[in-house]
């Protein structure tokens, strides 16, 4: 009984001590939001730093996969504080997730815990995980804690910023509506993207999410000319490697090996936490990438923020949640799914200073859009581009579903009357064609009325004209990539809906850019048949 009383007194003392510096922590966070803090070394490589000698020291009590329990003698570190320990000569960062009883905290490891032993010392850094920010990050690949992983040496900056930030105040946010032209016909016509908005690319495995996101980087980053940040969250390491070299080939980034180790002139920073990383890294790497994007935005830049894949962020959260002992909700996801998603998505916003335009690939498990992970993402997006397996099976790429995809920008007050009318006509024709497909499959085309036969012919041409050769797929298709201006896209589909190209064969519209190319291809095909 006496023991219980003394332990509760100790707990009360700890709580008092803990509550006192909270305002100080808040000030430090707001200070880092306003600007950035200086760090004595460009990159935190070593676990033997001066502040750690004076910091609170704990010992490891338990290791369960990616979760590590650490016991402290004195006051406990704050929630979200970064702890550091040495793991076989490497610096291991642990993030405080829970306060348990008996002066113990439960932490999530940002790297493998293989090699940790009970009784090992752990140091409280007194701050949250911070990553380097600023122009020095452009052209570099970093991991979740901001360490460079591209073998080009340390990142030459002293500016760092905590990965946990508050979303901007309502009065700071910008509400202007402007279209971001991508050069991809199906996107620009039927589900246009918003500059400074959030876009989701939904699709199952192997329907082309990553190829589409790479084409968007190629088209927008080149035309846009501003800075981009790419966060690779739990995806294939091979794709991350390919993207790095493709960015160098397309001159979005500068190869440091050809430039005396410098990446000056690069336009994109890359932050990777790939499939082989522990769940802690995959659950935080999106925040690390977003922090770099926010820093550019606060300096007055219009930033592009690409995430591949948001589902892996949710998946990592579910793994961590289970290890932390939380009771899972529907389909095994974490009970805090909506909160975790909201905390990330609300930070991706435009302010009066600058903008963040976000493009997020979202894997759809078993092609089920009602799954809680993709369904939770829908609420936060300005535009959704749904990739369909049935369209991919027809060989039409990008395999964007023109009827399931949606954008709040498709409004006559934003895009103009002509664009809106043409988009509605295209969707009406495709919807009618979809409703007739069962009749065609059972009875054949001959049983349709003349009007329906004409409509089906136009719908099939529209379907093929929605395909487009990509720059990033040139090596596989052998067709040069096409970037189509919005005016050309509207002109082409307007003519197709009006029946101006009824005399041309369907094949003329497959994998071409503008309508003029389709007309030329059609004439060539007709000439070949007649000869």
From Swiss-Prot:
It is an enzyme of class 7 (translocase). Keywords: ATP synthesis, ATP-binding, Cell inner membrane, Cell membrane, CF(1), Hydrogen ion transport, Ion transport, Membrane, Nucleotide-binding, Translocase, Transport. Its EC number is 7.1.2.2. It is found in: Cell inner membrane. Residues 1-48 are annotated as: Disordered. Residues 19-29 have a biased composition (Basic residues). GO terms for molecular function: ATP binding; ATP hydrolysis activity; proton-transporting ATP synthase activity, rotational mechanism. It is a peripheral membrane protein. It comes from the Bacteria. The keyword Transferase does not apply. Signal peptide: none annotated. PANTHER family: ATP SYNTHASE, ATP SYNTHASE SUBUNIT BETA, MITOCHONDRIAL. F-type ATPases have 2 components, CF(1) - the catalytic core - and CF(0) - the membrane proton channel. CF(1) has five subunits: alpha(3), beta(3), gamma(1), delta(1), epsilon(1). CF(0) has three main subunits: a(1), b(2) and c(9-12). The alpha and beta chains form an alternating ring which encloses part of the gamma chain. CF(1) is attached to CF(0) by a central stalk formed by the gamma and epsilon chains, while a peripheral stalk is formed by the delta and b chains. This is ATP synthase subunit beta. The lineage of its organism: Bacteria, Pseudomonadati, Pseudomonadota, Alphaproteobacteria, Hyphomicrobiales.
């Amino acid at each position: 009984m006496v023991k219980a009383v003394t332990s509760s007194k100790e707990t009360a003392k700890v709580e008092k001590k803990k509550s006192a510096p909270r305002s100080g922590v808040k000030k430090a966070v707001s200070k880092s939001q306003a600007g950035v803090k200086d760090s004595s070394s460009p990159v935190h490589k070593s676990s033997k730093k001066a502040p750690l000698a004076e910091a609170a020291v704990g010992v490891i009590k338990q290791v369960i996969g990616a979760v590590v329990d650490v016991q402290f003698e004195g006051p406990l570190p704050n929630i979200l504080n970064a702890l550091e320990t040495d793991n076989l000569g490497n610096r291991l960062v642990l993030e405080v997730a829970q306060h348990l009883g008996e002066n113990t905290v439960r932490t999530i490891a940002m790297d493998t815990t293989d090699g940790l032993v009970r009784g090992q010392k752990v140091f409280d850094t007194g701050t949250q995980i911070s990553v380097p920010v600023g122009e020095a990050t452009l052209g570099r690949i970093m991991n979740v804690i901001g360490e460079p992983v591209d073998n080009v040496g340390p990142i030459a900056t002293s500016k760092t910023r905590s990965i946990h930030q508050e979303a901007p105040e309502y009065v700071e946010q910008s509400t202007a509506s402007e279209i971001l032209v991508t050069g991809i016909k199906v996107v620009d016509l039927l589900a246009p993207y918003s500059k400074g908005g959030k876009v989701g690319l939904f699709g199952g495995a192997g329907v082309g999410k990553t190829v589409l996101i790479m084409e968007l980087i190629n088209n927008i980053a080149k035309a846009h000319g501003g800075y981009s940040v790419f966060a690779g969250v739990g995806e294939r390491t091979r794709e991350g490697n390919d993207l790095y070299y493709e960015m160098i080939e397309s001159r979005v980034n500068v190869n440091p090996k050809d430039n005396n180790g410098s990446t000056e002139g690069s336009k994109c920073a890359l932050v990777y936490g790939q499939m082989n990383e522990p769940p802690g890294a995959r659950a935080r790497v999106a925040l690390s990438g977003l922090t770099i994007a926010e820093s550019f935005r606060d300096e007055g830049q219009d930033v592009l923020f690409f995430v591949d894949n948001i589902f892996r962020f949710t998946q990592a959260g579910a793994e961590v949640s289970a290890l932390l002992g939380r009771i899972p909700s529907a389909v095994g996801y974490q009970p805090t799914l909506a909160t975790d998603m909201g905390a990330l998505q609300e930070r991706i916003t435009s302010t009066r200073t600058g903008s963040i335009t976000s493009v997020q690939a979202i894997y759809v498990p078993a092609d089920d859009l009602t799954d809680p992970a993709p369904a939770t993402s829908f609420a936060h997006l300005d535009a959704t581009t749904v990739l369909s397996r049935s369209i991919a099976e027809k060989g039409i790429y990008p395999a964007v579903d023109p009827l399931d995809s949606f954008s709040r920008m498709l409004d006559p007050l934003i895009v103009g009357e002509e664009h809106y009318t043409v988009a509605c006509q295209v969707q009406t024709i495709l919807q009618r064609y979809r409703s007739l497909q069962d009749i065609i499959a059972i009875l054949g085309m001959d049983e349709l009325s003349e009007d329906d036969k004409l409509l089906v012919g136009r719908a099939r041409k529209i379907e093929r004209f929605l395909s487009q050769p990509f720059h990033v797929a040139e090596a596989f298709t052998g067709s040069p990539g096409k970037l189509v201006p919005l005016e050309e896209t509207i002109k082409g589909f307007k003519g197709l809906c009006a029946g101006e190209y009824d005399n041309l064969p369907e094949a003329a519209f497959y994998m071409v850019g503008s309508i003029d190319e389709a007309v030329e291809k059609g004439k060539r095909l007709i000439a070949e048949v007649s000869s």
